[in-house]
Structure formats: structure tokens, C-alpha cells
């Protein structure tokens, strides 16, 4: 079977766009070929900083012939209908159509349209220019003399050449020379920009990849990542260190080089007085380098790992020297930020009003930054006021939550007023991702309680399903207050998530609240805090996602969750107890009996059958119905008492006693008795079954 090789070579593609672009190319090309009637065995995409490539193997040489029969009007139809049919079918006269007779419908015209298959080369020539012209780059550009013309080609960076070859695996291939904006596809590519700039003639993927590697280009991004990672580990180990691994940085760096060369640089040990998080971010963000640490250690070393795209004749000494100069300059800036943040602000006299408002100690650096944040009226959101106003709301909300979380009120208040103070530090101004973390470090430096310092970092957590949940009670309180304030505020101004759009990360905030409540066992009645049933429904959606991810069945969640259930921890405990019960033998049998009872009852209610208001013991004629009535009376009381005591397992055990009586009732008793009074009484007995099980869950929503 023939194979198709495609390469689009350009100036350097931003690393963050490469993987998705290669995937888009694969999907767009294969979808277009399949739509044109071709099939293929497999396809794989590749990318480097200067090229997107696609290898499609087992591609059919041509599309199949197509024969279509198109039914037309009756032969005695009006002339306009027949003319329209002929135009649509591409026929010039009715003589070119067939006449088919139908005993019921009469004679009518049928057009037989035969479409011969097309060669793959022709199809590729047709589809590729459109794919390239409409390629979904997040950002693109025009270039050259043609850039001012309407409809000029746009690409992420100037497109330089195209390779497109097609042919059998063991025979000579042919070039498919489609053209777009003056660039004609060929079998010529180029290797490394500096090491091998000469043209390379290729035939198919195997020699294409091999020739590129000879020309100092490793086509497979995963191989480049593997080389970088292993070489970085080895060079660190050889120096008595270990690599601080970073998957995101590894992905980015592998998209910056075609021929990775791993080197080690260093900086003065004096810079290690800077927090390791700042060092790591400085080196990562500005120079795309990895940091190292002593083997088995926690602190960083003064050695860093860099990845070059050039195999230098001096072994990389000049490259290391140049990178080292930049790293040292950046660390010097970081050290300056770190020291300035620990000092006094120059305009303290302008901050006294804000300091008084929040009870701040104007002699402490972090307090000064909070006062500055308030005094500058820094906007949180146009409709939700300033950061200072937000801190005041969080402070009030945290105070209300103190009794629920059991945290010290004074520590909560202190943590609340300092929670956003580090937003005015120079370190966070330079590296916003360090917010919270720097607050903790600066709080510790000025002697804050350990719980307060922890809360400044942890109140942002958890920031996703796998992030750590705060453990300290003060941190839990501030984290809840922060997230609840965000959700309440955006609900108040009707800025809710819609579809896939969630610009303010409200789903993440709600999931954070759910995780804190459940994983730290916090009993918080959400309606008393949010006072919004629609927001409570949003929490329910996040709770369902969380519980399903934990392995809970969706039907059991629905059976327990009522619209006004605002104690999410109790909902989770009910689901846990129901899951254990419903998977037991007693639970399965009771579920079957209960569903039979509720379905029969629902059918009679729908028909308008009379059902007694209550069960009359005088009308209980058979032993089975008497036994069931007695069992329900006892089980219902025991289950209700257990639920009131929040002992859901005991509630389930109480209901399990109904299994035998329910089974015997349906074996021995005819519900629809001829006597209307007895029938109404027995239906009332079924209603008692529904009400008894309803104390713990809506069994009608449980599948099985």
C-alpha cells in the first residue's frame, strides 16, 4: 500500500503551539482524504521548531468508483419538475434517464449517476491548499511582498517549503506538486539551520527521518524529550547532584531545539539566600533552564542545566558563559526584589487610614503592603469593587465560619487581613504564580503565627482535583471564605460559567469548596452562607463530578441529593452508606421489592385509584400484610431516629429488616383486591414502604 509524506517547513514555531498544530494537521488531512473516498491504515504526526510533518501509511491509490441512483418525478409530472430533476442530476434530456415502473406509484424517472474514482495525487492536490490556507493557528502572520494582497497566505511564521511525496513502500515515489502562494511542494527539505543547511532529497518517511537525523534534526519530539531528560540526569549525577524535574519545562525546551545538547552552568552561591521557588522560576522563565539540588537534598544547588540547539566546537563553553551571565543578572534582580519586600515602603504616612481600617501594624512590611493594596484602590472586578473591599468581605465571612471550622478567631482575623498583602510585593509582581507562597515566607519573616503564615499560602488551595487540600483550621477557614466570596460575588452580578467558558475559574473554586468540606470533614450549611439556591445547584454539579471521580454511582448520588441539600458532607456520607447497603444481598432484594411497590403505586395514582389516607389495621386480612405493617412501623421509626442521629449505616440496617416482609407480601397478597376498601388500604401500605425508604434515599432513582 502506498504512503504519503507531508512536511510544512517554516521559521521557528512557538513551542507552546507545536504539539497541537501537528495534531490539527493530522486530523485535517486524514479527515479530508477520508471524506474524498480514500482509506488509510495509520497516520502519525511529528514536529520540530521548524517543521510539521505527517506520515500516512497504507493509503489507497485512488478513491472507489461511485454509482448513485437518484429518483425523480413521475413521467407525467409537469415540465418544471422534470427540468429541475434533470438539472440536479446533470442530465441534458429525459432520454438519458431511466424509466422505472411501480405498480402503485406508476412510472417515474431515475437518473443513474456514475462518478469514477480519483487518483490520490489529484485528491491531495485539491485538499492541501485549503487546509494550509485555513489552518487553525491561534496567531498567524503574513509576510513578503504578497502580504498586502487580499487573501494572502497566513502562517504562524513565514512558510518556507513543502514536501509532499506519495508512492508504494518499496518502489520509487512521486512528488505531488501542489502550489500555494508561490510555494510548490517538492521532495526537498533542509536539516539543521546551522549544522546542515544544505538541501536534502527525500522519497518516503523512512529515509526522510533518517536523513534529517544525519543533518542534525531529531524529528520525534518524544525522543528529543527523552534525550534531554536522560542527559540532564546524567550530567547532574556526575556532579553529585540530581535534576529537579519539570515536565512543562521539558515539553517547552524540546520544542526549542532540533538537536539537543545538554550543558551545565553555575551561579554564585550567595544567590542561594533567595527562596528556592524564586530561583527556580527566575531560571525557568527567563532562560528555560532546569535547576538542580544535592542528591537527596531539599535545597537547590548553584548549578543549572541548559539545553542548546548547537553542538559547539568548544564543547559549549561560550554558550554556558553567555547563559550564566543572563542567569546571574536575573538572580541579582530577584535578590533585589526579595530584600526590598522585607523593607519599609517610602510613603508610610499615606497608609495610616488603610492600616487603621484593617487593624494593621504599619511597622511590619507585609502589613504595609496590605495597606498599600487598599490605599491604591486596586480593582478586583469592575462590578465587585477593589481588592481592599474584597479583603473586608473575606474577613467578615471568615469570622462567620470560625465556629464551624473550630479555628482561633484572632488568628483567622489576622490571616484574613493579610491574605492578599503579597499582591503588592515586588516578587509577586515579577512572578504572579508565587502569590500566596511569598505571603507565607514574608509572614514567617515578620514573626506571624505559623497558622497565619500557612493560611496565606494555602487559602488558594486546592486549585484542581489533584492539588493539596489545606489541613490547618485557619487555612481551611480562609480558603473557604476566599472561594465562597468569589462565587457569591460572581453569582450576584450574573457572571456564571456557560458551556466551556469559565473565565473566572468558578468551577475550580466550587470544586475547591467541595473538596475542603468533604476531605476535611467540615459541616457547612451552604444556604445560610450563600442564600442562593441556584448557586447551591452549581455546588451540587461539582459534588456529583467529585463523587463520581471517587467511584460513586451516579444513580445513588441522585437518589440521595435533594435540591435543598446544603450540607455536602452529609450527602457524601449518605451516598457512602447507600452504596454499601445497595450492594449487599438484603439491599438488592429490598430495592427490587421497593421498586415494585413504588411502580405499582405510581400506576394506580396515575389512574386516579382511591388510596386510603392511612393504613387501617382492621382491614389487614392476611398474615403477610399484617407482618409488613408491623415491620414498616418499627423500621421506619428506627431509620428516622438513625438519620436524625446522622447514623446512616444504622438507618440502612433498619430498612434491611423490611426485605423478608416485603417479599412475603408480594408472594401472598393481591394488592388489587375486588373489595375497594381493602385495595385502598393495601395501596396505603405500599405508600408506607415508599415513605420508609424515602427517609434515606429515593429508591425510584436507583437502577437495578
Curated annotation (Swiss-Prot):
An annotated Gene Ontology molecular function: arginine-tRNA ligase activity
PROSITE patterns xrefs: AA_TRNA_LIGASE_II_GLYAB
GO cellular component: cytosol
InterPro entries: DALR_anticod-bd, Gly-tRNA-synth_bsu, Gly-tRNA-synth_heterodimer
Location of this chain's protein in the cell: Cytoplasm
EC number: 6.1.1.14
Keyword entries, A-Z: Aminoacyl-tRNA synthetase, ATP-binding, Cytoplasm, Ligase, Nucleotide-binding, Protein biosynthesis
Main location: cytoplasm
UniProt keyword annotation of Transcription regulation present: no
Known catalytic reactions: tRNA(Gly) + glycine + ATP = glycyl-tRNA(Gly) + AMP + diphosphate
Transmembrane helix listed as a keyword: no
GO biological process: arginyl-tRNA aminoacylation; glycyl-tRNA aminoacylation
PANTHER family: GLYCINE--TRNA LIGASE, CHLOROPLASTIC_MITOCHONDRIAL 2, GLYCYL-TRNA SYNTHETASE
Subunit structure: Tetramer of two alpha and two beta subunits.
Similarity annotation: Belongs to the class-II aminoacyl-tRNA synthetase family.
Protein's UniProt name: Glycine--tRNA ligase beta subunit
Source species: Rhizobium johnstonii (strain DSM 114642 / LMG 32736 / 3841)
Source organism phylogeny: Bacteria, Pseudomonadati, Pseudomonadota, Alphaproteobacteria, Hyphomicrobiales
Amino acid at each position: 500500500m502506498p504512503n504519503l509524506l507531508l512536511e510544512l517547513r517554516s521559521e521557528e514555531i512557538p513551542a507552546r503551539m507545536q504539539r497541537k498544530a501537528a495534531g490539527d494537521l493530522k486530523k485535517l488531512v486524514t479527515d479530508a482524504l477520508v471524506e474524498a473516498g480514500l482509506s488509510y491504515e495509520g497516520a502519525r504526526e511529528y514536529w520540530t521548531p521548524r517543521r510539521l510533518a505527517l506520515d500516512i501509511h497504507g493509503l489507497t491509490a485512488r478513491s472507489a468508483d461511485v454509482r448513485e441512483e437518484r429518483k425523480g418525478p413521475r413521467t407525467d409530472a409537469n415540465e418544471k419538475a422534470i427540468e429541475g430533476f434533470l438539472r440536479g442530476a446533470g442530465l441534458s434530456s429525459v432520454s438519458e434517464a431511466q424509466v422505472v415502473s411501480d405498480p402503485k406509484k406508476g412510472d417515474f424517472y431515475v437518473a443513474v449517476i456514475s462518478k469514477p474514482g480519483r487518483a490520490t495525487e489529484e485528491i491531495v492536490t485539491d485538499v492541501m491548499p485549503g487546509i494550509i490556507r485555513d489552518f487553525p493557528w491561534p496567531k498567524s502572520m503574513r509576510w513578503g511582498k504578497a502580504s498586502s494582497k487580499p487573501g494572502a497566505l497566513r502562517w504562524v511564521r513565514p512558510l518556507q517549503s513543502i514536501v509532499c511525496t506519495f508512492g508504494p513502500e518499496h518502489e520509487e515515489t512521486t512528488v505531488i506538486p501542489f502550489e500555494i502562494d508561490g510555494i510548490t511542494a517538492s521532495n526537498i527539505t533542509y536539516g539543521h539551520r546551522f549544522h546542515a543547511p544544505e538541501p536534502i532529497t527525500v522519497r518516503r518517511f523512512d529515509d526522510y527521518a533518517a536523513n534529517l537525523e544525519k543533518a542534525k534534526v531529531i524529528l520525534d519530539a518524544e525522543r528529543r524529550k527523552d534525550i534531554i531528560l536522560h542527559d540532564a540526569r546524567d550530567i547532574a549525577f556526575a556532579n553529585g547532584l540530581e535534576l529537579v524535574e519539570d515536565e512543562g519545562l521539558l515539553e517547552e525546551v524540546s520544542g526549542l531545539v532540533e538537536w539537543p545538547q545538554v550543558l551545565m552552568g553555575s551561579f554564585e552561591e550567595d544567590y542561594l539566600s533567595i527562596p528556592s521557588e524564586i530561583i527556580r522560576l527566575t531560571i525557568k522563565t527567563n532562560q528555560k533552564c532546569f535547576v538542580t539540588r544535592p542528591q537527596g537534598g531539599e535545597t537547590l544547588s548553584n548549578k543549572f542545566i541548559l539545553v542548546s540547539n548547537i553542538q559547539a566546537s568548544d564543547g559549549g563553553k561560550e554558550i554556558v558563559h553567555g547563559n550564566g551571565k543572563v542567569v546571574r543578572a536575573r538572580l541579582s534582580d530577584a535578590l533585589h526584589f526579595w530584600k526590598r519586600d522585607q523593607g519599609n515602603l517610602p510613603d508610610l504616612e499615606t497608609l495610616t487610614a488603610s492600616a487603621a481600617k484593617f487593624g494593621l501594624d504599619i511597622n511590619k512590611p507585609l502589613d504595609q503592603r496590605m495597606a498599600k493594596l487598599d490605599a491604591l484602590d486596586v480593582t478586583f472586578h469592575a462590578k465587585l469593587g477593589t481588592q481592599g473591599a474584597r479583603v473586608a468581605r473575606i474577613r467578615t465571612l471568615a469570622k462567620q465560619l470560625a465556629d464551624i471550622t473550630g479555628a482561633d478567631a484572632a488568628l483567622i482575623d489576622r490571616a484574613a487581613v493579610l491574605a492578599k498583602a503579597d499582591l503588592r510585593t515586588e516578587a509577586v509582581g515579577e512572578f504572579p504564580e508565587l502569590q500566596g507562597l511569598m505571603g507565607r515566607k514574608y509572614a514567617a519573616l515578620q514573626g506571624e503565627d505559623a497558622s497565619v503564615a500557612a493560611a496565606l499560602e494555602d487559602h488558594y488551595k486546592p486549585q484542581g482535583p489533584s492539588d493539596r487540600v489545606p489541613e490547618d483550621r485557619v487555612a481551611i477557614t480562609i480558603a473557604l471564605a476566599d472561594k465562597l466570596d468569589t462565587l457569591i460575588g460572581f453569582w450576584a452580578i450574573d457572571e456564571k460559567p456557560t458551556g466551556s467558558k469559565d473565565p473566572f475559574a468558578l468551577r475550580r473554586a466550587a470544586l475547591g469548596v467541595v473538596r475542603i468540606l468533604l476531605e476535611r470533614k467540615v459541616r457547612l450549611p451552604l444556604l445560610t452562607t450563600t442564600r442562593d439556591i441556584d448557586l447551591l445547584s452549581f455546588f451540587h454539579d461539582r459534588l456529583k463530578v467529585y463523587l463520581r471521580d471517587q467511584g460513586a454511582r451516579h444513580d445513588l448520588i441522585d437518589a440521595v441529593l435533594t435540591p435543598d441539600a446544603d450540607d455536602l458532607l452529609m450527602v457524601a456520607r449518605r451516598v457512602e452508606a447507600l452504596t454499601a447497603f445497595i450492594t449487599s444481598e438484603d439491599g438488592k432484594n429490598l430495592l427490587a421489592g421497593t421498586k415494585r411497590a413504588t411502580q405499582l403505586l405510581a400506576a394506580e395514582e396515575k389512574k386516579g385509584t382511591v388510596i386510603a389516607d392511612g393504613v387501617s389495621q382492621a382491614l389487614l386480612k392476611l398474615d403477610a400484610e399484617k407482618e409488613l405493617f408491623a415491620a414498616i412501623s418499627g423500621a421506619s421509626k428506627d431509620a428516622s431516629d438513625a438519620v436524625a442521629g446522622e447514623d446512616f449505616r444504622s438507618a440502612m440496617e433498619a430498612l434491611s429488616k423490611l426485605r423478608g416482609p416485603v417479599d412475603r407480601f408480594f408472594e401472598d397478597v393481591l394488592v388489587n383486591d375486588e373489595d375497594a376498601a381493602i385495595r385502598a388500604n393495601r395501596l396505603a401500605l405500599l405508600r408506607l414502604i415508599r415513605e420508609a425508604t424515602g427517609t434515606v434515599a429515593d429508591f425510584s432513582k436507583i437502577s437495578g
